[in-house]
Every structure is written in structure tokens, then in C-alpha cells.
Amino acid sequence: MRTIIVGGGAGGASCGARLRRLDEKSEIIILEATDEISIANCGLPYYCSDVINDREKILVSNPQTFKQLLNVDVRLNSKVTSIDRKNKKVAINNQTELSYDNLVLALGASPLKPSINGIDNPKIFTVRTLSDADKIKEFIIKNNVKNAVVIGGGFIGVEMAENFIEMGLNTSIIEL
């Protein structure tokens, strides 16, 4: 029995671990489109400000650990580009096909980009992945940024603002 889990965030990683506890023999494959699995998203603001200065501390796990501890095959940079439900196959990166007995979609969330003029400006960032946080850090350092505006007053938005202030940036929050 082969189960394919599409998405390697917290939900996909937890699903893989739970499935392994329920069945020690089945084949479990996690397909993650990015180059990271199961990151500590709540730590991203603190990574941006270097309160957490070790990038590896944001990574909750890695493919090798999943294989060693759980016998779960994690494949990074493996974007599912189509699903053939009738024949029970997924296409990966428009190249490889994998068959499955069970399919779990654990696609997670994506940041909301409000419909406002200029939202696609290269100086505007979303923060959802470790790669996003890397880009924010790099931009702030490279451009000697002094001011920041955070759109969104949820947990991550407030923590981003807190950490921008920690970095010495004049920071405002806009809640839509």
C-alpha cells in the first residue's frame, strides 16, 4: 500500500508520522514543492531579526530524519503538477509519475496579498517560508532599510513588527 502526501508543512509531516504509527509496513511518500520540510513558521519573525540566528533551528526536521526515524520518503523540490484520480497517479514537476493507493492533500496556507496598488513591488514581501525570511533579511541588510510597514495584525504580523523594531526599524502595522 502506497500513500502519497502532497505537502511537507506541519500538516503533511504530522500526517506522515501518524500514518507510520498506524501502519509500520506501508510505503509513505511526502512530496514537497519547496526545499524545506516542516519548518517552525512561528519562528520566522525571530529568524529575520537574528533573535534566532541559526537557520537550522527553524527547520523542524529533514528528509534524512524522516527516513531514519519513520521510514517515510520525503522528496523536496517535488511539485505535484497534476493528479489523475481515475488512474491514481500524480505527476511531479511535469516529468515523473507516481502511482498511489491513498492520496492526502496537505497543501497548507498561502499568504494573502491584498488587492492594493503596488502590491507586486519588489520591496513588498510575504512571510510564509524560510526562503521568504531569507529574502527579507537579505533585503534589509543590503538596502540599509530604516522603515517597515507590516500589513496584517495577526500573530505573525505582530511578531514581524516586534522583530523589525528589535532590529531598529521604524515600524507600522496596517490591519485590513
Feature-to-residue mapping (PLM):
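FAD-binding core/adjacent interface of flavoenzyme oxidoreductases
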Residues: 1-4, 59-151, 166, 172
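Beta1-alpha1 glycine-rich phosphate/pyrophosphate-binding loop at the start
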Residues: 1-72, 163-176
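N-terminal Rossmann-fold NAD(P) dinucleotide-binding loop
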Residues: 12, 157-158
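Conserved acidic functional residues
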Residues: 84, 159, 175
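Short, glycine-/small-residue-rich phosphate/pyrophosphate-handling segment
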Residues: 153-155
